[in-house]
């Protein structure tokens, strides 16, 4: 596709930590967090004026789905806006709880973590969405994309400590562990069980194959990748989306890339994640063995050739290719200094290793099983800008930024220049008019005027037939609403 729509859905971990007496269950914490949303929108599943969606997912996991984005810059801003929106809600909830909104004052902290595994070992996801053409052979595309997704974690994993070590090599028991504290590339790799499936929780595949394009089904399909880690660093998210987009473009244009049939996707994911040298091997059905480094170098070489032949289709392509190259070189050499301000797993590893080194220099035992290290691992993913370890690193200049100052804050209310603009204009107009409405990714409906329901099947379109008529209707209602509230003096 010459142009592509992108989106990311991020689930967040939620925890309430009291300063004294008083506890909140996860359900009560979620209810406190979403109270302003429920008060304003009468629901905990809402589309926002910025075009994105805010909702409470299964298991009381707060989730933000970005609006449809037509560029990586829009996507980075939208994803970060979701973090800021939830951070705002958490601060509001804390004030309400302290004021006694639950019947008694509760003094504590409401934490939201942009990670993928909680303390009980439950996993929650970061789902990527890529619009593709309906003309493609979907199953063939999946088969060719799988080797890339299995090995991509060495580039864009969020990193994770394992106090009891990783799984025993070759073991099929998910509870097995080596007993040696360790660090892995990925948080999600230990929780994925197959290549493709219609399930998102029971089987946890790399790719969710449910056919829900949220667009004209005769033209488009949605590639729904659900095995990725949630990223904090903007360069890591950029590389994740840009590299996957390039691979999809190569496959769409039938550009020659590797085609590997992996014997066991779960085993390959785990072996790769827990080997920071990048040399752990996985087997293919033809009896050959490959490493993540070798496979990713093949994709990178192909991407460079593709860009040389077809040209760069956005201004981040050269940076993405360079970061891709530097990350593979860093893994091969074992020297992460060239990427430890851009790639999440390397940024966090540098932070944790520095603490371990200081503790040991002071004569204190420390490793990846230490309580303080586990705390730092979690604190890296805290989304509160004032409290987060990650954001402290950003303020110190230890993490590279991609977005210009203010872009994410603006994206809390401003939609991307896609179909999201239609949704935003409709929502703002309906709110101003005091009209009840129902919105999803494709439909815009005024509950009192169902005959004016808009069907927006083109995710690229910023306008559609009937939109201006509905907006004019709502503007008239808004004027009536205002005149009724503030009648002119006699």
Swiss-Prot record:
Pathway: Protein degradation; proteasomal Pup-dependent pathway; Protein modification; protein pupylation. InterPro entries: Pup_ligase (IPR022279), Pup_ligase/deamidase (IPR004347). The active site is at residue 57. Mg(2+) binds at residues 9, 55, 63. It catalyses: ATP + [prokaryotic ubiquitin-like protein]-L-glutamate + [protein]-L-lysine = ADP + phosphate + N(6)-([prokaryotic ubiquitin-like protein]-gamma-L-glutamyl)-[protein]-L-lysine. Its EC number is 6.3.1.19. The keyword Repressor does not apply. Residues 160-181 are annotated as: Disordered. The reaction mechanism probably proceeds via the activation of Pup by phosphorylation of its C-terminal glutamate, which is then subject to nucleophilic attack by the substrate lysine, resulting in an isopeptide bond and the release of phosphate as a good leaving group. Belongs to the Pup ligase/Pup deamidase family. Pup-conjugating enzyme subfamily. This is Pup--protein ligase. It comes from Rothia mucilaginosa (strain DY-18). The lineage of its organism: Bacteria, Bacillati, Actinomycetota, Actinomycetes, Micrococcales. The gene is pafA.
């Amino acid at each position: 596709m010459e142009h592509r729509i992108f989106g990311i859905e991020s689930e967040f971990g939620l925890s309430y930590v009291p300063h004294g007496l008083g506890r909140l269950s996860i359900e009560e914490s979620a209810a406190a967090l979403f109270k302003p949303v429920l008060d304003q929108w009468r629901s905990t599943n809402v589309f926002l004026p910025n075009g994105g969606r805010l909702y409470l997912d299964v298991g009381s996991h707060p989730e933000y789905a970005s609006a449809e984005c037509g560029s990586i810059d829009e996507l980075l801003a939208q994803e970060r806006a979701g973090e800021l929106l939830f951070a705002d809600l958490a601060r509001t909830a804390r004030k309400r709880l302290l004021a006694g909104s639950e019947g008694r004052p509760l003094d504590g902290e409401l934490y939201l973590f942009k990670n993928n595994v909680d303390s009980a070992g439950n996993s929650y996801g970061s789902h990527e969405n890529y619009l593709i053409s309906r003309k493609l052979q979907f199953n063939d595309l999946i088969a060719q994309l799988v080797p890339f997704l299995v090995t991509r974690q060495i580039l864009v994993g969020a990193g994770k400590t394992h106090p009891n070590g990783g799984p025993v090599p070759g073991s099929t028991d998910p509870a097995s562990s080596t007993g040696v504290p360790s660090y892995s590339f990925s948080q999600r790799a230990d929780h994925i069980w197959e290549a493709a499936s219609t399930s998102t929780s029971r089987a946890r595949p790399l790719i969710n194959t449910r056919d829900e394009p949220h667009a004209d089904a005769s033209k488009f399909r949605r590639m729904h990748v659900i095995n990725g880690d949630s990223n904090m660093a903007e360069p890591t998210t950029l590389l994740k989306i840009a590299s996957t987009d390039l691979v999809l473009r190569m496959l769409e244009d039938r550009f020659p890339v590797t085609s590997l049939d992996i014997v066991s996707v779960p085993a390959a994911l785990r072996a790769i994640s827990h080997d920071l040298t990048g040399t752990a091997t996985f087997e293919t059905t033809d009896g050959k063995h490959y490493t993540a480094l070798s496979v990713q170098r093949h994709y990178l070489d192909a991407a460079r050739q593709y860009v040389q032949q077809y040209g760069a289709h956005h201004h981040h392509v050269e940076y993405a290719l360079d970061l891709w190259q530097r990350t593979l070189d860093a893994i091969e050499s074992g020297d992460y200094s060239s990427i430890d301000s851009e790639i999440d797993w390397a940024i966090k590893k540098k932070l944790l290793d520095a603490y371990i080194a200081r503790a040991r220099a002071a004569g204190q035992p420390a490793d990846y099983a230490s309580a303080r290290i586990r705390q730092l691992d979690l604190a890296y993913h805290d989304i509160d800008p004032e409290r987060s370890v990650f954001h402290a690193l950003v303020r110190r200049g230890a993490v590279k930024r991609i977005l210009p100052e203010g872009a994410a804050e603006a994206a809390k209310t401003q939609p991307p220049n896609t179909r999201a603009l239609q949704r935003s204009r409709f929502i703002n107009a309906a709110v101003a008019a005091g009209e009840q409405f129902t919105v999803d990714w494709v439909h815009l409906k005024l509950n009192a005027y169902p005959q004016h329901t808009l069907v927006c099947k083109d995710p690229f379109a910023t306008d559609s037939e009937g939109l201006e008529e509905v907006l004019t209707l709502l503007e008239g209602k808004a004027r009536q609403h205002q005149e009724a509230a503030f009648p002119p003096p006699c």
